[in-house]
Amino acid sequence: MSSIQLQKYLDLLPENAILNAGIAIAGLSAAYAIGLVIYRLYLSPISKFPGPKIAAATFWYELYYDVIHKGQYFHKIEEMHEKYGPIVRINPHELSIRDPDYYDELYVSGSVRPSDRYEGFVNGVVDFEGSHLATVAHELHRKRRKPLDPYFSRAGVNRLEPMVADLTEELVVKRFEEFKGTGKVVRLDHAFTAYSGDIISALCIDEPPHFTSTPDFTPSWFDLFHSGVVTLPLFMGLPWLIHLIRLIPESILAVIDPGAQNWNTFRMMCYDSIKDTKREKGAQPTKDTSLLGRPTLFRHLVNSDLPASELSDERLLREAQVLIGSGTMTTAGTMCFLVYYIKSNPEIHRRLTEELKPIMEGYPHKKPSWAEIEKAEYLQAVLKEGLRLSFGTIHRRPRVSPNQPLQFKEWVIPAGVPVGMSAYFQHTDPKIFPNPHEFNPDRWLSNVTPAMKKNYVPFSKGSRHCLGMNLAYCELNYIIATMFRPGAVDFDLFETTELDVKPTHDMVVPLPSLKSKGFKVKFN
């Protein structure tokens, strides 16, 4: 319609009609907003639960602390619990519980009751729809996770162990010893992200990226996940932004956000691998994957009996992105945390190296197995303390009981209401862990109480516990044992403080201070 024709129709409208229409729309919008607030405050199924009225009325309260204050709503929730008690309403839809005795009641196996994921959480997780992690319904999640479990079980990771051992040797012996005597400053957060990325990629796809062997450990790989995680609170608060961004052509998006190219490169790495695996399947007359090459998770999935809808390129692409992304960043962050506290505490360093002497003797010509490394009691205490204080995730993990209400003390939580608990609260309860913010491996060597074991939840619990738990333990055992064995290459912390490793921001994935210039060490 031309501007002349549009003006013709506008001239036919009564005087002030456009103004009146605008006023009417504004009035209806205001009435809707007021009605919504009244419903949330007084008529909602969770209106009787304690908590600040502003949090019950609007999501903007949470968005303010997580976007403007960069992932600080978990501290606000902590304040709410201090004021209102063990159960609080933290937004219009969701409850938070802080009670060490209730964790095992909320995070249960599928045989106890189904546990759905909170749809509001899933909607803001960028580009992961269709993956097991972003699946809302319990039964569909179970079907999607079942074929993944064997690859991440203890037995599955044991089969992967030789590759983990070889990559550890490549990083710590080949790469780090190149720097011996050079005084070279290295970003360990880049090195560990490359290492973990190579391991999880080798498990999933046929051609891992070999980031560990690149000169500077491919900083763009670290930047890809770090920059993506920083945006998560915004997208979780305003999920419609994701759909808006998808309307922008990739060529324009690359100009607006240069980091988008890293994401596209990652997507294409996953997509190309999946397409190659499908082409391989089409050319192979048998389902025997042992004839196809190195066993990988996605070779197994493509050749499985899953329905065609579960094997679409797009769904498998997103599953690959989730598995590789989540298997890279949190494990690398825990490695940085552990190395910092070991190097910052000479007595911990000394005891650890002394214990590792008989186990790592002859390395790398004689490599100990993961099971042999696990016999080092002090090392296991160090790892547990590192996982306790790096939390896995700080963010509460909301669960929904779709069919039956939950009972918490005198409170009946209606079916369908998302309820979350946080490893941060479980791991920093002073009644369970005295001086909870102190890095003290000795707490795991004597007087270990049942409450300590019960409330140690870096990988969560229940039917949706962290898939990569065994792989993370394997990597942590190998990397710490190898770096701190007697005779390992010597290095010192360089322009690095606790702020560079300590979880400070809850961006769903915990991050250290956003002012950090990276975790750096200098090789002597």
UniProtKB/Swiss-Prot annotation:
Q: Which reaction does it catalyse?
A: ophiobolin F + 4 reduced [NADPH--hemoprotein reductase] + 4 O2 = ophiobolin C + 4 oxidized [NADPH--hemoprotein reductase] + 6 H2O + 4 H(+)
Binding of heme, residues: 466
Task: Name where it's found.
Answer: Membrane
- Organism superkingdom: Eukaryota
Q: Which CDD domains match?
A: CYP58-like
One of the GO BP terms on file: terpenoid biosynthetic process
Q: Its GO CC terms?
A: membrane
Name any cofactors this protein relies on.
Answer: heme
Q: Which GO terms describe its molecular function?
A: heme binding; iron ion binding; monooxygenase activity; oxidoreductase activity, acting on paired donors, with incorporation or reduction of molecular oxygen
Q: Does the keyword Kinase apply?
A: no
- Gene symbol of the encoding locus: oblB
Q: Which family does it belong to?
A: Belongs to the cytochrome P450 family.
Name the enzyme group at the top EC level.
oxidoreductase
Keywords from UniProt, A to Z, are: Heme, Iron, Membrane, Metal-binding, Monooxygenase, Oxidoreductase, Transmembrane, Transmembrane helix
Q: How does it sit in the membrane?
A: Multi-pass membrane protein
Tell me which EC number(s) this protein carries.
1.-.-.-
Q: This protein is called what?
A: Cytochrome P450 monooxygenase oblB
Which residue ranges traverse the bilayer? 18-38, 225-245, 322-342
Asked if Transmembrane helix is a keyword of the record, the answer is yes
The metabolic or biological pathway listed in the UniProt record of this protein is: Secondary metabolite biosynthesis; terpenoid biosynthesis
Q: Which Gene3D superfamilies match?
A: Cytochrome P450
Species name: Cochliobolus heterostrophus (strain C5 / ATCC 48332 / race O) (Southern corn leaf blight fungus)
The free-text function statement in the UniProt record for this protein reads: Cytochrome P450 monooxygenase; part of the gene cluster that mediates the biosynthesis of the sesterterpenes ophiobolins, fungal phytotoxins with potential anti-cancer activities. The first step of the pathway is performed by the sesterterpene synthase oblA that possesses both prenyl transferase and terpene cyclase activity, converting isopentenyl diphosphate and dimethylallyl diphosphate into geranylfarnesyl diphosphate (GFPP) and further converting GFPP into ophiobolin F, respectively. Other sesterterpenoids (C(25) terpenoids) are found as minor products of oblA.
